[in-house]
Each structure stands twice: as structure tokens, then as C-alpha cells.
């Protein structure tokens, strides 16, 4: 914590300036594994005499609307995970933790360091019955889908519930026919809020991602949102690569000019010990497994990058960017200018071109394409000499040489594109672009009339 001594000249009083920490620091997965030297922790207190058979009944009655403690439903998912087995064809390790060796039989529970205690409470079913394993995929599927339902925008929840019912309908049995999925999903928040639910769901999703052909693969419909939870900043960068049509992530990062972006790029990229690009790693599940309380890789921890990426995407007409949530940003004037430069550099890259032809005419086709691009850039420049840099450095240098002054033609082009953005939702990047983009070109970046 920063502590600086200052001196008041008139009263000759010395005092200490202390800076409170209003935000918690980010937590890297690698740090957690280094400090704990174990798999993600899972502490469970199972009900007395718990078995898969008894827990099934509790889960069924929970789904039917009975007042069943969510912890008993977690017991069922835990017992069910023991039946999800697969033999490893290669060693499976992550962050130094051995999940299994080649030839071992593993389950989702193999991903966890499990600490079990006994719950003295018993569950007395309202309607005792014997259920077989044929109901499991239907029961577990509904329970896991409650996670995605509760993370879905409320306007989309009804449609999601209908989709869940359609996907799971083939697995319904006589015992499950009285379950009303829409009613259960509406009342499922108590289960999703249980501290062990995300851990169990993450273990199932990571297991099924490793074994996509497993018989329970359809369960991922409800859990896939847990993969890369807390990685939305990385997802933003990857999306920038896509919309700019770059071959690699580094090629996209080269277009980040604003100074406020530097610390965020470092935050996500400088720790080489995290398994960002390792297959079947714990990394994408850092939030679900509780190995990071504040991810360094989220959009919330990298607001300037999130804002820039979706400003660019909105200008280039991406519905995903237009509908992205507008979050707290950094130095907005710098980000707006950065977005404008990237837009002008890429607006003609629509991707449509002649890709096949006879060998003898290919040079002629390339010459025609170059001439067309030249005409388009000249027209876009409002009659000024066409800007034809070939890389990020060249484009930035072009605007540096102009003292970052945009021509009236360029501002008109921006206005035309912005006005063409369709109806937008409140709180989105698209709304912000329509209302504020032009006015946030900083005063130092004067418009030069042609």
C-alpha cells in the first residue's frame, strides 16, 4: 500500500498520505497452483447413507418442485460423476497436477482434490421409488442446464427453456414425465448459487471437452459457458483477429496503438507460466474451479481492450460488437482515435475476390484488383492522395504525420457508417457508438476540411 509523506508549509505539519485499495488484485491460475500444489479443491458434506440410488430420488423431487436442499442435489451430481468413466489414451496433466496416466480410467472427479465429510441429515422422499440409471442423463441434463439458464438474458430465457426441453425430450422416461422444465428452470437459482455447483459443472464440462465422444456429451449444452468464463478479455483479442482477418493473435495486437492498452496486453500476455494455449488445461475453468477470484484475462480486468475491440467491430458492422455490453473504459479519446484508424485501414477488406482461375490470367486478375483498391481508397479519401500503408506502423505514421487530423471526408464516412448501425439495445457498445463516437474524437484531433 502506497504511503507518502507530505509537509504543509504554513503550519509546518507533516502527514502521511495513504492510498486505500478499492479494487482487489487479479489472481493468476499459475499462482494458485504454485501456492497450493494440488488439484482444485472440492469440499463436500454428503448426506447420511448417501448412494446414487437415494440421491436420484432427491434430484427427481427437486426437479418436480419439492423443497429439497440443493446440497442433496449436489450429492446426486457427485455420485453420478463416479459413473462417467473413460480410459486415457495419453497422459493428462495440467499445471503440474497429474490427472491420469495413459491407460488409467478417469472420471470428472479425477480433476479434483476431494475432501469429504458426513452430513448427519437424511432426506426422506415424499414419494419413495426405485429409479434406474436410465433417468440419469435426463435428470443431470436438466440440473446442469440451470446454470446456462440463469446466465442467459431474461428476454432469451423462455427460448432457452424450450430448447432444453427439445434436446432432452428423447431421454425422458415414465419416471420423469411429470417434470416441467420451464417451471424448474425458473426456480433453479438456489441450486446454481450453491458454492459447489460450479465446481461440479466445471469438472463435467472439462471431462467432456477432453472426451467429446463420451455418451454423456449432450450434457455440455448446459455447461459449455463455464469454459473460458473469466477469459472474455482473451476472447475479445481473438475476436479482433477474426474481424480484421489476421492470421495470428500477434498480428491483431499490433493494431493496438493507445497507451492505455499496454498494461492490459502485458497483464494477459506477460505471464508465460499460465497454460493459455495448452489443450485440456484447468486454465479455461479458473473461475468455475475457484482458482481465481478475479481473472487477469476477463473483459472487466481489461476494459480498454474490450472497448476498442467492439468499437472497431461496431464500425465494421459486426452484430456481436454492436450488442456487446459497454463497460468501464480507459482513456476513451485515445481508444476512439485508435478505433477510427483501424476502421479506415480495414473497411475495404470485405474478403470477396476472385480466388480461382486459369494460370494464364492470374496476373491480370491481381492487377485489376489492385486498381480497384486504389480507386476505392482514392474515393474514400475525398480526392486526397490515397492512403496506402501496408502495415500498422505505416497507418499510424500516416496519421502522426497529419498530427492526427481527420479530413472532413473521413468524418463524414464515419458518420455514415454510424448512422447505418441498426436499432441498438441500451447499455451496448452499439448504442455508445451512435451517441458518442464522433463527439469523443478529442479536441486535439481537429477535423481538417477539404
UniProtKB/Swiss-Prot annotation:
Keyword match Flavoprotein: no
Annotated compartments: Virion; Host cytoplasm
UniProt xrefs under Pfam families: Rhabdo_ncap
Main localization (coarse): virion
GO MF annotations, alphabetized: RNA binding
GO cellular component, one term: host cell cytoplasm
Keyword Ribonucleoprotein set for record: yes
Gene3D superfamilies: Nucleoprotein, Rhabdovirus nucleocapsid protein like domain
Keyword set, alphabetical order: Capsid protein, Helical capsid protein, Host cytoplasm, Ribonucleoprotein, RNA-binding, Viral nucleoprotein, Viral RNA replication, Virion
Role description: Encapsidates the genome, protecting it from nucleases. The encapsidated genomic RNA is termed the NC and serves as template for transcription and replication. Nucleocapsid assembly is concomitant with replication, therefore viral replication depends on the intracellular concentration of free N, termed N(0). All replicative products are resistant to nucleases.
Subunit structure: Homomultimerizes to form the nucleocapsid. Binds to viral genomic RNA. N in nucleocapsid binds the P protein and thereby positions the polymerase on the template. Interaction of N(0) with the P protein prevents the uncontrolled aggregation of N(0).
Name the UniProt record assigns to this protein: Nucleoprotein
Species this protein is from: Drosophila melanogaster sigma virus (isolate Drosophila/USA/AP30/2005) (DMelSV)
Lineage, opening ranks: Viruses, Riboviria, Orthornavirae, Negarnaviricota, Haploviricotina
Amino acid at each position: 500500500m502506497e504511503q507518502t509523506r507530505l509537509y504543509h508549509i504554513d503550519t509546518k505539519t507533516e502527514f502521511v498520505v495513504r492510498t486505500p485499495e478499492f479494487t482487489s488484485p487479479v489472481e493468476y491460475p499459475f499462482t494458485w497452483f504454485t501456492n497450493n500444489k494440488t488439484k482444485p479443491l472440492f469440499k463436500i458434506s454428503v448426506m447420511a447413507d448417501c448412494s446414487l440410488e437415494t440421491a436420484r430420488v432427491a434430484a427427481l423431487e427437486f426437479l418436480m418442485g419439492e423443497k429439497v436442499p440443493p446440497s442433496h442435489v449436489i450429492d446426486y451430481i457427485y455420485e453420478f460423476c463416479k459413473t462417467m468413466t473413460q480410459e486415457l489414451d495419453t497422459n493428462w496433466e495440467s499445471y503440474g497436477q497429474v490427472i491420469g496416466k495413459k491407460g488409467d480410467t478417469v472420471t470428472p472427479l479425477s480433476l479434483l482434490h476431494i475432501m469429504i465429510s458426513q452430513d448427519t441429515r437424511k432426506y426422506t422422499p415424499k414419494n419413495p421409488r426405485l429409479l434406474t440409471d436410465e433417468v440419469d442423463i435426463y435428470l443431470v441434463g436438466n440440473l446442469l442446464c440451470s446454470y446456462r439458464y440463469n446466465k442467459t438474458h431474461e428476454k432469451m430465457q423462455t427460448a432457452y427453456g424450450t430448447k432444453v426441453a427439445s434436446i432432452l425430450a428423447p431421454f425422458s422416461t415414465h419416471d420423469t414425465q411429470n417434470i416441467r422444465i420451464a417451471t424448474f428452470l425458473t426456480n433453479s437459482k438456489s441450486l446454481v448459487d450453491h458454492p459447489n455447483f460450479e465446481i461440479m459443472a466445471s469438472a463435467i464440462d472439462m471431462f467432456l471437452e477432453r472426451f467429446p465422444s463420451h455418451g454423456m456429451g449432450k450434457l455440455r449444452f448446459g455447461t459449455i459457458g463455464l469454459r473460458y468464463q473469466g477469459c472474455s478479455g482473451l476472447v475479445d483479442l481473438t475476436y479482433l483477429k477474426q474481424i480484421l482477418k489476421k492470421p495470428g493473435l500477434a498480428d491483431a495486437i499490433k493494431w493496438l496503438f493507445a497507451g492505455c492498452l499496454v498494461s492490459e496486453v502485458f497483464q494477459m500476455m506477460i505471464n508465460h507460466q499460465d497454460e493459455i494455449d495448452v489443450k485440456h488445461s484447468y486454465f479455461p475453468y479458473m473461475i468455475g474451479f475457484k482458482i481465481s477470484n478475479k481473472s487477469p484475462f476477463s473483459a472487466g480486468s481489461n476494459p480498454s481492450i474490450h472497448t476498442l475491440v467492439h468499437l472497431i467491430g461496431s464500425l465494421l458492422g459486426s452484430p456481436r460488437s454492436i450488442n456487446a455490453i459497454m463497460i468501464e473504459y480507459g482513456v476513451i479519446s485515445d481508444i476512439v482515435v485508435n478505433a477510427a484508424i483501424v476502421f479506415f485501414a480495414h473497411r475495404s477488406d470485405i474478403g470477396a475476390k476472385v480466388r480461382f482461375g486459369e494460370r494464364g490470367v492470374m496476373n491480370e486478375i491481381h492487377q485489376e484488383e489492385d486498381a480497384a483498391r486504389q480507386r476505392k481508397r482514392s474515393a474514400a479519401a475525398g480526392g486526397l492522395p490515397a492512403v496506402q500503408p501496408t502495415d500498422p506502423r505505416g497507418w499510424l505514421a500516416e496519421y502522426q504525420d497529419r498530427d492526427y487530423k481527420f479530413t472532413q471526408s473521413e468524418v463524414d464516412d464515419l458518420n455514415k457508417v454510424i448512422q447505418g448501425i441498426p436499432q441498438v439495445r441500451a447499455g451496448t457498445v452499439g448504442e455508445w457508438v451512435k451517441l458518442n463516437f464522433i463527439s469523443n474524437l478529442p479536441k486535439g484531433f481537429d477535423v481538417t476540411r477539404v
